[in-house]
């Protein structure tokens, strides 16, 4: 092996410093660690992890709040290391191009009266979004509750409220869209309040104060004391990326990021889908309606799980883009 003097010469530093590195009285800089790894043929990741660990212990090792601070830092590092996928895959880019061709057709089509069509699509959206969450109302029953004010025998009060609330939440996001209001914390909490109104009055429009688990998923949402900070980061991320990303990618990212934080006791899925659709509507697209049948639901959950646990959003972005493309195609062929 190399002698201390030789290592010092090769690194271009004083020999006494090497001795201090060895004894632990001095810490090498990042650049010195990288040079050492190369010189001593040590795996860079191994030595960097060891160096960072020592750095953390030196700074906070003896502090009584160290563990809690580390938990907060871990969540934040995870969040910040999930960059928006700015370099899009060829497959995704191809679908986005096809969507934009359809959107151009839609823009000329909109000159005709499309109120009746929009109404039909919104009804289907309420039906499907609630069906994903286990609501057993049929499309016809959903229509009767919304448009005729009927009560369906054999269906629970909660199921009726889910239909009415979702319908009102759509009206609210359309109002935001018409006023050109950006999504922010106040508007998000209002949307959530509408979704859970009369169902969980004490939780409607409030972040959760307890830990939650997502049934059937290995993703563990952040601890309740981290939720407020994660949501601050969520809106900062939106403001930072809203002008640089394709609107479909932006909408899908905001959907995935919100459902991953899971900031509410209940209603996370419906609220995340409404946020996504608000962004789509604001950019002149139409509601992306994820179906609630078993196969569609499982596909949706699978792509979300991959984004959450493997930090790979490609499948989820493709899934949302495909849904929007199908929604546009359907809208354009309705007579």
Feature map (PLM): residue ranges:
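FIC/Doc superfamily catalytic core
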Residues: 54-63, 74-335
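DNA major-groove recognition helix of helix-turn-helix/homeodomain DNA-binding modules
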Residues: 29-46
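Generic structural marker for isolated residues within well-ordered, non-membrane alpha-helices
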Residues: 4, 33, 276
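Short alpha-helical DNA-recognition segment
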Residues: 2-20
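Short amphipathic recognition helices of helix-turn-helix/homeodomain-type DNA-binding modules
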Residues: 43-67
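Short, conserved catalytic or interaction motifs in soluble domains
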Residues: 23
């Amino acid at each position: 092996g190399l002698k201390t003097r030789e290592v010092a010469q090769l690194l271009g530093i004083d020999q006494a410093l090497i001795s201090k590195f060895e004894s632990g009285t001095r810490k090498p800089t990042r650049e010195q660690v990288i040079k050492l790894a190369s010189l001593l043929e040590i795996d860079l990741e191994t030595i960097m992890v060891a160096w960072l660990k020592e750095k953390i212990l030196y700074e906070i090792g003896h502090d009584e709040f160290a563990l809690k601070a580390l938990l907060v830092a871990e969540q934040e590092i995870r969040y910040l290391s999930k960059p928006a996928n700015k370099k899009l895959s060829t497959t995704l880019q191809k679908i986005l191009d096809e969507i934009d061709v359809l959107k151009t057709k839609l823009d000329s089509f909109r000159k005709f009266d499309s109120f009746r069509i929009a109404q039909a699509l919104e009804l289907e959206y309420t039906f499907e979004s609630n069906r994903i969450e286990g609501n057993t109302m049929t499309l016809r029953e959903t229509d009767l509750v919304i448009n005729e004010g009927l009560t369906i025998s054999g269906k629970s009060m909660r199921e009726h409220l889910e239909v009415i609330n979702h319908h009102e939440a759509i009206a609210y996001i359309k109002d935001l869209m018409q006023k050109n209001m950006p999504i922010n914390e106040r508007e998000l909490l209002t949307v959530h309040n509408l979704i859970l109104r009369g169902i969980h009055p004490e939780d409607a429009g409030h972040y959760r104060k307890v830990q939650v688990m997502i049934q059937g998923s290995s993703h563990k949402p952040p601890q309740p004391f981290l939720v407020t900070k994660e949501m601050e980061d969520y809106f900062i991320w939106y403001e930072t990326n809203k002008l640089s990303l394709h609107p479909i990618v932006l909408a899908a990212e905001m959907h995935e990021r919100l459902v991953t934080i899971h900031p509410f006791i209940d209603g996370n899925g419906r609220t995340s889908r409404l946020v996504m659709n608000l962004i789509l509507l604001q950019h002149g697209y139409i509601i992306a309606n994820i179906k609630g049948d078993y196969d569609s639901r499982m596909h949706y959950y699978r792509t979300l799980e991959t984004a959450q646990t493997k930090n790979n959003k490609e499948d989820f972005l493709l899934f949302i883009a495909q849904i929007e493309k199908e929604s546009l195609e359907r809208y354009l062929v309705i007579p």
